[in-house]
Structure formats: structure tokens, C-alpha cells
Amino acid sequence: MSSPYGKVDEREHVRLEARRKTRKNIAIIAVSLVILAGIVIGAVFGTMAHKKSPETVETNNNGDSISVSVKAVCDVTLHKEKCFETLGSAPNASSLNPEELFRYAVKITIAEVSKAINAFSSSLGDEKNNITMNACAELLDLTIDNLNNTLTSSSNGDVTVPELVDDLRTWLSSAGTYQRTCVETLAPDMRPFGESHLKNSTELTSNALAIITWLGKIADSFKLRRRLLTTADVEVDFHAGRRLLQSTDLRKVADIVVAKDGSGKYRTIKRALQDVPEKSEKRTIIYVKKGVYFENVKVEKKMWNVIVVGDGESKSIVSGRLNVIDGTPTFKTATFAVFGKGFMARDMGFINTAGPSKHQAVALMVSADLTAFYRCTMNAYQDTLYVHAQRQFYRECTIIGTVDFIFGNSASVLQSCRILPRRPMKGQQNTITAQGRTDPNMNTGISIHRCNISPLGDLTDVMTFLGRPWKNFSTTVIMDSYLHGFIDRKGWLPWTGDSAPDTIFYGEYKNTGPGASTKNRVKWKGLRFLSTKEANRFTVKPFIDGGRWLPATKVPFRSGL
């Protein structure tokens, strides 16, 4: 069946094709400039610091000389010793430029992850450990996919330099997230095993991320972002997208119809997904008729560009009840889990009915790049919405929960959403967010923009906080949102103790409502009351590169503040 987007996409394609060809050539030249700049900077700083010939400024543990490029690259990493050890021993290291060193670093990381996979595969034991080990195997497989993405895309000239850097940082951030999730998924007695086998690959992933972040800053210093990424580069009428979405009924042009009463092609969503072609660039539209579908659904990583559209967020509902207390790892509890890139859901509800006593029980988990959710509901208690990894956008959605009910380590923007804390278990307090950034060079965080945060029911006797820092570099901002008076005046809660790491980034900007006063907020170094310039970093266009991919989804969005 023909796609409702065909005519619009074709028109945009024709309009942009000539510009893309020009941009491709410019981007290739720009990448070369970045590489050249890296060599020059490495040579200058290396020579100044050591007063030696620019060819050799350092030696490794074996007494071998290290080139200025290796020195420059490794100096920006968090694990310098590991960097010198791996890159310094690269074949012809002295003749490699920073881009070649970056690619070599990624290849070594892939080799280390492969070793870890073999170690996990050979350590399967009792049934409980097998569940977590299999989860780790899946996560490490995703890690390798993302590392391979960096190798296949780093020479692709069909994007601007800033877009290229953002892609690479996203995939490397996700690779780090998947490895961390693997360790956290293991039973406590197995975590030392996981940490020891993933130590090398985790450090190498961090180093590769640091290198590409550094090269991105060099690109900025050459003003490449300003030249190559301007509003003229993407001539898209966002309001036209809104009109098309409102005027086009995707249900009438669906490729597959799911209905509990048998009036569709299939009775379950899981069965419908089996018809999705692998890695297809064409949209596959699945219409889910009204009803409650009791199934745990997984959109596999090879299921690209799937649209799931329902009859309404309170009418077409996917319901599950997997939870941690009954023996399922958090990563596997999701009622609806998304791993296929380019996924979109509209007018759907996702519920986990396990209840508060079952603790972690995810309604929706998203671990796929370039995903959008429009007019959807995610309803559970603890850990409702798992924004696990990659770039994600939520528009006019409703998220209901109690403890850490928006959590994960993706780059996510929630815009014009309703966020509704509900009554938790007796003795619990509500925390809306728990962001999981573990590395300063990751480009991840949770951005809550123009949302309404209000209680679901009477919560006057329940302490409710905007969030707590799950990891040392936790990054969360709340901007231009309405905050009901039930929000505790301190605003934020420590994960442990009475403070938070200085390295977190929590921000508030121009919020309104009785809960928005910052007068009595916690006095943390990492809590900032943002300027307009700072807040703009966390809007759709710069934070999730939304101007590049959201227009094609036809989901309405605000690109800036």
C-alpha cells in the first residue's frame, strides 16, 4: 500500500537534492580541515610542552616513541594510560592522523567487546543467571552495532560536520550505555565478573567518545557549524507538517491492521511485526484498533521505520505486568520495547499493571535512534518510561508514575507533555526523573520543555521531587513548564546522602506555577538556573538534531525555546 508521505517526501527530496550534493563536497573538505587542525594542535602543544621534535614527544612503557598525533589525541581522554597503550602500539602509529587513530580506537574497542561476549557466553549457569547473561549478550550485540555505525559513517560526506559529530557521539554514548546496563542487569554476585570483563571495552569506548568530542570542538572553532548547519539547509515548513498530520488518517493507509475482534489481518501486534521487512527505508504503518492487547511487544533492531497508530491513547492499549520482584531484570520488564530506528507511535497507550509493590516495572522502553511518540500514554508506577539510549522525542504525551518514572541515558526531549506523579507505596516519595549519564563527553540528558507537571489525585501528603541524579554526570533540564504546588520546594533529591556530585547538570528555566519558585531549591553546585543561551542547548534542534529528522515524521514540534 502506498505511503501517505510519498508525495511530500518526494517534493522535499527534489528540493534538497542539489543542496545535498554541494553539502557532501563541503562536508568532506570540512572533515579534512578538522583532521588537519588536530594534527597541527597536537604538534604545537606537544612541542611546546616537551621541547622535543614534533615527531616524537612521549614514550610508552616499552620505551617506544609516540607520535604527536597520539599524544594530542590521548591527552583529551579520561583513560590516558589505556589510550597510550592501545594507540601507541597501533601499526604505523607515528604516521596516523587523528581520524585514523579514532577509527583504530573503535576497532580495538569492538575486539574487546567481542572478547567480553565470548566470556559471557561461556559462563551460562543456573536459570536466573542465564536470563541476565542473555540480556547482557543482547546489550553487547547492540554495543557492537553502534561501534560499527561509527566506522561506516565516519567517512560519509552526506552530512554536515556538526551532524556527523553528533551522530558519532550518539552512537558512542549508546555503546557506553549498553555496557553499563549489562553490568547493572547482572545479579549482585555476578557484577564483579561483568565489570572485570567489560573494563577494557568501557574505557576504550570512553576514550573514543572523548576523541570525537574533541574533534567536534575543533570544528566549532573553525565556525563549521555556522557555515554548514543553518536554517537554509533544511527548508521545511514545520506547520505544513502539522497540517498534514492532522489531515491524513494513517489508519486508512495502514499496511497491516491489528484487531482483537478478528476484523484485521492479525489479532496481536507481535504477529504484525513479523511482516515488517528488515532494515527497510520505507515506512511500515501498523494500525492497532481499539482494545486492550495483553502482550509484551518488542520492535527488533532490524525493524526500521515502523509506525504504530491506534484509535486513541485510552482506546488502543498494550498491557503487561513483568517486573523485577517476580524475577525479570528491569531491562526486560517493558510492556513495549523499541530497538528499531526511525520508530514512531501515535495515539497509543502503554501500561504496566504490576503495581507499586513490584518495584521496577517498565511500560515503555526506547533504545532506538530517531524515535518519536505523539499523543501516547505511558502508565505505570516505578520506572514507567525507560528512555534508555539514542535520540528520542515525545510530544503531547502523558507519563504517569511514582519513583524515577522517566529514566535512562538517551538524549530525549519531552515537549508539551503531561507528567503526572501518582500515589506511591506507603513510605515512598516520588521522583520524576533519574538520568543516567556516566561520562562527561556523552551527549545525553532529559529535556522537559513546555510541559505540565501536576498530581494525579491528591498528593498533599507525598513528597514529590523533580528528580534525583542516578549517575555522576546526570543531566536534566526543565524549561518553560508549569509546576504544580505539590512539588517539594527543594526541587531535587539526592540519590544517596544529603547532596549530589558536583559534576551533575540540573537546570531550570522560566518555569511557572506555585512549584516553580527557586528560592528554596537545594544548594548544589550542579544545579543551575539557566540563561536563555544555556537553555537553548537543550531544545529540539541542537539537543537531538531534530531539525534534520523530525520534519519527516510529521509530528509537530518546536525547534527552539
Swiss-Prot record:
Enzyme active site: 383 (proton donor), 404 (nucleophile)
GO cellular component: a single term: membrane
Function: Acts in the modification of cell walls via demethylesterification of cell wall pectin.
Record field: transmembrane: 26-46
Annotated Pfam families: Pectinesterase, PMEI
Annotated membrane topology: Single-pass membrane protein
Pathway(s): Glycan metabolism; pectin degradation; 2-dehydro-3-deoxy-D-gluconate from pectin: step 1/5
Protein name, UniProt field: Putative pectinesterase/pectinesterase inhibitor 24
